[in-house]
Amino acid sequence: MSIIKHAVISAAGMGARLGLNMPKCLLKFSGTTIIQHQLELLKDIEDVRIVGGFMEKDVIKVVKSIRSDVVFVRNPHYQDTSNTYSISLATKGLKNPHILVDGDLLINKKSFLEFIDSFDGKNSLVGVTNSSTDDAVYVEIDDKDKVINFNRNVKSKYEWSGIACLNNIIVD
């Protein structure tokens, strides 16, 4: 994991479809919040940034009790913007490879480490899966297995899985 110097967790959304009136990153599985699980996976990364918006004070409180050095980036427009906007706020000025993680992603440690280890630092690595949801961020892949587009409108065979390792590209 040494080539990755920064991590961004996008946790600004309202999680409205769940209907629980709480950020999805604060949901507990086996007694541990998703954000706590993610911070454990990212413990060796020195610069962790979390984008907050909805109920951000609750997220900050939980995160600070786990890791005090996390940088919080506020998305004041979380109700009207996409995950991409949140990511663009947190990645401004990053000059080294970084990992992006959706705040609602619960990932197996072994799978996470395999994903990180497969990142060479030269080419971006984007986690995709076969499309299976109705409200997916669909991913278009070219004939060389490179991601060429993300969108919510045009269904495709693949969807964004919520994780990516990027090398000095601009997200806007």
Regions found by a protein language model. Give the residues of each.
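N-terminal glycine-rich phosphate-binding loop and ensuing alpha1 helix
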Residues: S2-V59
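Short beta-strand-to-loop acidic/aromatic patch adjacent to the donor-nucleotide binding site
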Residues: N96-L106
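Conserved core of the sugar-phosphate nucleotidyltransferase
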Residues: N108-D172
